[in-house]
């Protein structure tokens, strides 16, 4: 078995893909013509977005959706970069909100946290051990 996808359920798939393109430099791999599903070219593990309508059809018992008006869910998307302050500033410039400023952890890693316009929590971090 291998880890293949992280799928984030959002109110607007195309807007979420566009945000990740503008904020973090990812390229769009695919956007379904219905607009209900799309993927970014994000390396070995695919980062994908699906509509809340698709989530409802996949999760018959319901699910907890993410919203910028609520506390973040207990999960994050961690993006590794050599320049956290620059990535943090760029994300804020294109619509992210700051959840935690850039800081250096006791083990030497530099991290910050932003929230996407749809409410998803994103950690920006240097590689561990550098």
What are these regions (language model features)?
Residues 1-5, 27-79, 86-115, 126-130:
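Vicinal oxygen chelate
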């Amino acid at each position: 078995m291998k880890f293949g996808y992280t799928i984030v359920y959002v109110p607007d798939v195309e807007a979420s893909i566009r945000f990740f393109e503008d904020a973090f430099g990812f390229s769009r791999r695919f956007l379904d013509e219905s607009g209900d599903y799309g993927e970014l070219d994000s390396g070995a593990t695919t980062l994908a977005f699906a509509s809340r309508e698709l989530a409802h059809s996949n999760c018959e018992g319901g699910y907890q959706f993410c919203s910028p008006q609520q506390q973040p869910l207990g999960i994050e998307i961690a993006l590794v970069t050599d320049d956290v302050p620059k990535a943090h500033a760029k994300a804020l410039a294109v619509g992210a909100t700051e959840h935690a400023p850039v800081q250096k952890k006791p083990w030497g890693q530099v991290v910050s946290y932003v929230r996407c316009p749809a409410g998803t929590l994103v950690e920006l971090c240097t590689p561990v051990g550098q």
